[in-house]
């Protein structure tokens, strides 16, 4: 599967249960759990245009981040998205862009414990999804995260 070949941990790895216990569930999101949507996001190959199913909706602040992987690879610029609760020793208030942080997200190999700088901040609803890439391969389960403007209803 292409996603696993890229070193992605779509379920968020070891940090996932801790993060999901801390983030606030949205009681009445625009896209409810179980809804089918079309992805407009292009975070990963095969994502844009894929059908997805909403498996969670959370109220938080989403950040794009530039970070240096712990694997020694070159810096990753503009990675979308990590959330407030995936920042090590996070505070309740949103951070400003430019803030330097340590990541506790484990979305991709080398992300956990990486140092980074927040590029953008957006207080929003984020969604966890299951989807099958348009490029083929198996279903990606519990992918974190897409924002409301990155999905649209199935017509």
Locate predicted features:
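C-terminal motif of bacterial Sec signal peptides marking the signal peptidase cleavage site
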Residues: 7-10
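Bacterial signal peptide processing site
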Residues: 12-14
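Basic/aromatic-rich interaction segments and small domains that mediate binding to polyanionic partners
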Residues: 16-23, 28-29, 33-85, 97-100, ...
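A short, structured loop/turn motif at beta-sheet edges
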Residues: 92-94
């Amino acid at each position: 599967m292409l996603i696993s070949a890229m070193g992605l941990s779509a379920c968020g790895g070891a940090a996932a249960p801790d993060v999901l216990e801390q983030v606030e569930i949205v009681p009445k999101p625009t896209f409810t759990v179980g809804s089918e949507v079309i992805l407009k996001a292009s975070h990963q190959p095969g994502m844009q245009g894929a059908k997805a199913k909403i498996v969670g909706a959370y109220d938080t602040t989403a950040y794009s981040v530039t970070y240096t992987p712990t694997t020694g690879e070159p810096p990753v610029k503009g990675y979308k998205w990590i959330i407030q609760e995936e920042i090590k020793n996070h505070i309740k208030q949103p951070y400003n862009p430019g803030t330097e942080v340590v990541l506790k997200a484990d979305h991709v190999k080398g992300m956990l414990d990486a140092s980074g700088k927040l590029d953008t901040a957006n207080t929003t609803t984020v969604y966890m999804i299951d989807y099958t890439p348009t490029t083929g391969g198996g279903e990606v389960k519990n992918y974190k995260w897409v924002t409301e403007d990155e999905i649209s209803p199935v017509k």
